[in-house]
From Swiss-Prot:
Domain of life the protein comes from: Bacteria
InterPro entries: Thiol-disulphide_isomerase_rbB, Thioredoxin-like_sf, Thioredoxin_domain, TraF/TrbB
Sorted UniProt keywords: Conjugation, Periplasm, Plasmid, Signal
Keyword Kinase: no
Descriptive protein name: Protein TrbB
Primary subcellular site in the record, as a coarse category: periplasm
Gene symbol of the encoding locus: trbB
Domain Thioredoxin: 37-172
Signal peptide range: 1-22
Taxonomic classification: Bacteria, Pseudomonadati, Pseudomonadota, Gammaproteobacteria, Enterobacterales
One GO CC annotation: periplasmic space
Pfam family, one: TraF
Localization: Periplasm
Amino acid sequence: MSLTKSLLFTLLLSAAAVQASTRDEIERLWNPQGMATQPAQPAAGTSARTAKPAPRWFRLSNGRQVNLADWKVVLFMQGHCPYCHQFDPVLKQLAQQYGFSVFSYTLDGQGDTAFPEALPVPPDVMQTFFPNIPVATPTTFLVNVNTLEALPLLQGATDAAGFMARVDTVLQMYGGKKGAK
């Protein structure tokens, strides 16, 4: 289990070694509006701590609530894939609507209009996410940001209702081990 966590942690951070302007790319991923991030200076008499994102509660169909701030959607896409061109804008709209984060990897080195800043996928990331499933685009996973556990979501395009129904099913199957109440 700790090897899996180490690999997932490494893969989420391995994007930093992909290109020379890594810091700028990471800032663009975390700040999609292109706003530069400046480190906040703590007020006098307070200590500087890393702030945890505000909870974004999502009610599952079984009545449980899950904090979407504890999850990140990892998208594998290609700039020339017609299914990605169909699905990626849907995913981007859902991310904005529900407040979850999307980390996009590209298999062909190209983004698309929804995710133009997709990072080229390193080989170790491919091996971690696709050990026993075929490589297809688009493919999405839910990654728990606290445990780095990756849960397969979908391969192929779907509509908004289909994607959120799958998120609901996967989070119920996961049992809400982390971030659910």
